C-alpha cells in the first residue's frame, strides 16, 4: 500500500489504498473472482425478476462482524439496508453514490427531494432476506454489488464509533476474511 488510507468507511472511501483494504475487510452480497465472474458473498443465492427491476437475496447466517476489540455480531440484511441508506443520505456526502442511482428513490434521497430514508428501494425481510428494487434495469448492477459503496454497515457499530467510523483500528469492523489488528499512521516507519 503506497500510503495510509483516508478512510476505511466503505460508503465514503475514494482513494486506492482505502478501497484495496476494504476489499479484504468487508464481504458484500456478491464477490468478484479473479477471472471476472461473480460468486456468492454474504448472499448464498439471489433471483432477478423478469423485468430486471427486483433483486431478492438470501443471505448466509454464518457471516459475522468482528474487530480487534472482540466485537462479534451476525451480519444481517438490515446491515445492507443501513449501508445503502448511508450511501444515499446527503449528510454522508458519499463520493460514489451516483454510480448506484439505478436503485429506486436513491437519486431523490441523495438530492434531498425525499428525506425519508425508508423509501429507498432496499428492504429487509427478517435477518436473512434482502430485496433491492431498481428504477430501471441495469445489467452492471450485480457487478456494482462487489464494490466498496455496496458493503454492509452495522448500525450498532456505526453509532458506537461516535463519528469516527472507519478512521482507526478501534472504529473499523470487518465481516470479511481479515480484520484490522493495527494501523500505523506514521508513513516513515
Where in this protein do the model-derived segments appear?
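Aromatic- and charge-enriched surface segment that lines or borders ligand/interaction sites
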Residues: 45-96, 131
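N-terminal lobe/hinge region of extracytoplasmic solute-binding protein
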Residues: 1-50, 92, 171-178
